[in-house]
A protein has these predicted regions:
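Structured binding elements
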Residues: 155
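Conserved AMP-binding/adenylate-forming core of the ANL superfamily
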Residues: 76, 94-149, 166, 170-171, ...
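ATP-dependent adenylate-forming carboxylate-activation enzymes
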Residues: 138, 159-175, 186-195
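Conserved structural elements of the adenylate-forming
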Residues: 116-117, 272-292
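N-lobe entry segment of adenylate-forming
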Residues: 1-107, 111-114, 118, 124, ...
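Conserved small/polar residues in nucleotide/adenosyl-binding loops
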Residues: 262, 294-301
């Protein structure tokens, strides 16, 4: 194994939140010896509608643990709204580049907030609410991020399924989490071809998934697809018809945020449930120490 060491550039080191191995070890030691103080401090990077009354409770015999009990927050609000309210609405929030580099889209925080609120209201109009599970079966397009944020805004639990998986793979994951709706796209792109049958796969899947009531379809390629009246809805039409404002739902720290399934390569896929407060705190902490996206400290370094 190579023992080569590649030090960071002086510019990167100057902007780092951990400037030495000794500082990293100090952080690690504190996380082990004072976990409550460590994580309470890092949780303050988030916006909380209500503070927690108990940092953590656990019972290792029952394999039960809870963090930030009593605290209320919202993932979408933390990722989008607070940056708008802090005066950064015109800053870039999302950059998307398609299969063809000439195809790209950029969203500011304010633009993303507007898109997400309409999408959230579109979901609510279709009967989706807090605690309902939504399967998101799309490629890496802007609407994927918007759909995730829209679900978290209203308290729905999203479950992302890889966009190249088959109808059978969809069935397994949808039935396990009893998804109420699917968000997908007409067809998927691979190279110069537009023939990944994503909507067709969703149509096949719903024949064996009794919990699904609605399919929301993004018009990605413009390919002709079958739309079932009363069940299938075009994404753009639903969002255009939706109200412009949708307040973020305050969620308990231990409320489910999303379900991510294991690959299933060694057996039936297992759904891993991530809860709101703990996931956001860890993600914000990791981002703060690892993702140097700016050349100088930024108020958005925890999003």
């Amino acid at each position: 194994m190579s023992k080569s060491v590649f030090p960071p550039t002086a510019e990167a080191a100057a902007g780092a939140h951990v400037s030495s191995l000794d500082q990293y070890r100090e952080l690690y030691d504190r996380s082990i010896n004072d976990p409550e103080g460590f994580w309470a401090e890092h949780a303050q990077r988030l916006h909380w509608f209500e503070p927690w009354h108990t940092l953590r409770e656990w019972d290792y015999h029952k394999a039960e643990i809870g963090w930030f009990l009593g605290g209320k927050l919202n993932a979408c609000y933390n990722c989008v709204d607070r940056h708008v309210e802090d005066g950064h609405g015109d800053d870039t929030a999302l950059i998307w580049e398609g299969n063809d580099p000439e195809e790209s889209r950029t969203y500011t925080y304010r633009e993303l907030q507007a898109e997400v609120q309409r999408a959230a209201n579109a979901l609510k109009a279709l009967g989706i609410g807090k605690g309902d599970r939504v399967c998101i079966y799309m490629q890496m397009i802007p609407e994927l991020s918007i759909a995730m944020l829209a679900c978290t805004r209203i308290g729905a639990v999203h479950s992302i399924v890889f966009g190249a998986f088959s109808a059978d793979s969809l069935v397994t994951r949808i039935n396990d989490s009893e998804c109420k709706a699917i968000i997908t796209q007409d067809t998927g792109v691979r190279g110069t071809k537009l023939d990944i049958p994503m909507k067709a796969n969703a149509d096949l899947a719903v024949q064996s998934t009794p919990s699904v009531e609605k399919i929301l379809v993004v018009k990605r390629t413009g390919s002709e697809v079958t739309m079932s009246e009363g069940r299938d809805v075009w994404w753009h039409e639903a969002c255009e018809a939706a109200d412009a404002e949708c307040p973020a739902e305050p969620m308990d720290a231990e409320d489910p945020l999303f379900i991510l399934y294991t690959s299933g390569s060694t057996g039936k896929p297992k759904g891993v449930l991530h809860t709101t407060g703990g996931y956001l705190t860890y993600a914000a902490t990791t981002h703060h120490y690892i993702c140097l996206l700016y050349t100088s400290p930024s108020p958005r370094d925890s999003s």
